[in-house]
Amino acid sequence: MFYSFCKVGQYMTYFKFELIHRSKKSRARVGRIHTPHGIIDTPNFVAVGTNGTVKALNNTMLHDIGLQLMFCNTYHMMLQPGTDIVRQAGGLHSFIQRKLPIITDSGGFQVFSLAYGSVADELKSRGTKKQGGCVLKITEEGVLFRSYRDGSKVLLTPESSIKAQKDLGADIIIPFDELPPYHIARDALKKSLDRTHRWEKRSLEAHLKNPQEQAMYAVVHGGIDPDLRKESCAILTELPFDGFAVGGSMGKTKDEMHTLLSLTLPLLPEDKPNHLLGIGDLPSIERSVPLGIDTFDSSYPTRAARHGILLTKQGPLNITKSEYATNFNSIEKGCLCPACHHFSLAYIHHLFKARELTCMSLATVHNLYFMVQLMEKYRKQIQEDLI
């Protein structure tokens, strides 16, 4: 079954969602997202390449291991090298030499995270990061912030965010939104949500003036308030977005997140793809796939790799432990990633102890290959109605 979406009365040929199978056991589903740069099988994991690259890897390696969708951050690309330079290079795909699909965010997440700290920071009472406080003013027009690179003032609006994402030329783009802190009064949260909806509408209007063979996902907000989540779904599903991302705070625990997703996902159109923003650790994926999430993005597998944590079917292992100094087996038997195909645990352990940069590349390519294979396993289990 194919679902294709219209923009201003025009038939879209460049972005389609194809439903392959819906599980008889849960809301889990297998699908395909068709984009100008290829197909994304769902459910799937999205690697985060903040500055146009996944840390420690080049983009040809992502292609070789079959990682179908990559997430790049508009905020960072705006400040360095500048989206105009990327546009002159022919867009992100040409600039970073990636042939497969790319999704970019609006820049709002990074701006507000630097201002308030991440939800994780707040829950752990860390407060804002040392670059925090860079947001100077939030108005109806947008957000005025100070660049962490050179201290210059930058005004980010729905229109300028979309202009930047047009310069980047990703397959899927995100409207400008506000990310309020976790601990916020309901009145303030409602005010933030209303402004986010206005910003998302302005973003959509700017996008539709020049679709440029890009799809735009709305971002559902509302924090941990069920009524506001419902309101956000009701407002955004009335607009001609091509898909829906679930964003904002999802609670303190995985149980709270599960409850919010169980409420939110049935309110989204079944004929359009959805995405869970910034959540892609293994337990969260395991609990969210049965709810019908199509794609997940997270820096967890790559960040863990750089700290010596390798993902395996038996659970994560810490390669820096001395027990691996004389283990000449591969990371995981049967794994076909470059690290497992060529090198032993002992060698990778040695590289970490010697602080050789190669250790991060080998650990990262293994963890991402693990994620690719994990999502393939989930798709197979859904098609067999086991999930």
From Swiss-Prot:
InterPro entries for this protein: TGT, TGT-like_sf, tRNA_ribo_trans-like
Region (RNA binding): 278-284, 302-306
Residues that hold Zn(2+) according to the record: C335, C337, C340, H366
EC number: 2.4.2.29
Family to which this protein belongs: Belongs to the queuine tRNA-ribosyltransferase family.
Assembly with partners or alone: Homodimer. Within each dimer, one monomer is responsible for RNA recognition and catalysis, while the other monomer binds to the replacement base PreQ1.
Identification of the protein by name: Queuine tRNA-ribosyltransferase
